[in-house]
Amino acid sequence: MEYSTFGKHIIVDLWGVDFSLLDDMHFLEYHLVTAADYSGAHVLNVSKKEFQPYGVTVLVLLSESHLSIHTYPEQNFAAIDCYTCGTTVEPQIAIDYIVNILKPERMHIKRLIRGIGEIVTAD
């Protein structure tokens, strides 16, 4: 069986997010796994790390690639990354879910199409 190299990659910077949400590893893990499920992805594993004095990284390994968040609560900032291979998963659904939960004051987003030769911006 030959697999397609096509993939969608969405990177997001969130600013103005509540400190307590960004420093709660279990809250973020639950919502990233839920977001992955809603997008149609298959969760394989979750790796997470709390940093001192603040901050969290959660990486959700997907059969289709990954979903991650890195937080800087003291700056009310989160960086989210979602890359999915193939056409069966829609990463925008995962991103929309997370943004709705975190309610940032502002957001910067880039959507990329990968695996078709040149990396193409989908915005």
Curated annotation (Swiss-Prot):
Catalytic activity: S-adenosyl-L-methionine + H(+) = S-adenosyl 3-(methylsulfanyl)propylamine + CO2
EC number: 4.1.1.50
Signal peptide: none
UniProt pathway: Amine and polyamine biosynthesis; S-adenosylmethioninamine biosynthesis; S-adenosylmethioninamine from S-adenosyl-L-methionine: step 1/1
Pfam family, one: AdoMet_dc
Protein keywords: Autocatalytic cleavage, Decarboxylase, Lyase, Polyamine biosynthesis, Pyruvate, S-adenosyl-L-methionine, Schiff base, Spermidine biosynthesis, Zymogen
Cofactor note: Binds 1 pyruvoyl group covalently per subunit.
Subunit (UniProt): Heterotetramer of two alpha and two beta chains arranged as a dimer of alpha/beta heterodimers.
Function: Catalyzes the decarboxylation of S-adenosylmethionine to S-adenosylmethioninamine (dcAdoMet), the propylamine donor required for the synthesis of the polyamines spermine and spermidine from the diamine putrescine.
Name recorded for this polypeptide: S-adenosylmethionine decarboxylase proenzyme 2
